Amino acid sequence: MTDQPPSKDLIWSIGIYGGKSPFDLHPLPDVSNPILTCRDVTSTPAKFVADPFMIQADGTWYLFFEVLNQQTNKGEIGLATSETGHNWVYDQIVLTEPFHLSYPYVFEWNGEYYMTPETLVANGVRLYKATDFPTQWSSLGSLITGSCADPSVFQYDDRWWMFTCSTPYQHDTLRLYVADEIMGEWREHPASPIVEGNKRKARPAGRVLVLGDTIVRFTQDCVPNYGTQLRAFEISELTSRTYVEKENPSSPVLSASGHGWNALGMHHADAHLMKDEQWLACVDGSREVSLQRDHNHDARAAHIKA
């Protein structure tokens, strides 16, 4: 979630959903959402938690997420763990920088763990590698430079690809980059920008899924406000020269509930296929809070530009 000027007082929390497909996600009967809030963060005075990504290693689930530090007003990357993927325990802050961090897109490649968090304030996309997974991370350098919100990296057809929003305060332009090697030369795709001037389908909203010949990207629908709901697009053709996508008929796949922890919006999903052929996803949601309530407890205000 991009560091933005204040205009609306929201609080973001993290939940767990499941379903028979990544387009059919819903609350699970044995999960009490939200599974993680700012009150669970014991090592940092947190305003909110958001942008969750999870990965399983050696039988344990690891959840990485943005923690907005109330004292510095900068994002840091937090960690929680779970044996089942349903019940989570906060662990610690695992990555801080002098600038704002969010959207900790974590992935495994060749037996090593990497992360491309949003490093917009540092004018680019940085790649981090775990030197001692899951708690120690080191920067390997920048993949691309410029205004890049919510960078989403994935492998397909022996290449690396990256979606990112280049208008982080308007949420209306989606760009696509491609590289032969992750630390190699990244070039903008000929079809990029994929989306321009449309707040409903430009800003990335979680892990890109590669399902055989079909690629699924989740996107924020920022109408009427930032982070209102999630849409899903299926990419049926992706080459070094061409790009074809269509919206999944189930869109929007996640929306505001109208009450509780996700009353006002949902803007993120990281979905994983489980052994029982069901999907498990970490998601986030927002609700408005009163400025008169105790900001040191569950009413810590988060300032997000609508």
Where are these regions (language model features)?
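Carbohydrate-active catalytic/glycan-binding domains of CAZyme proteins
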Residues: 1-306
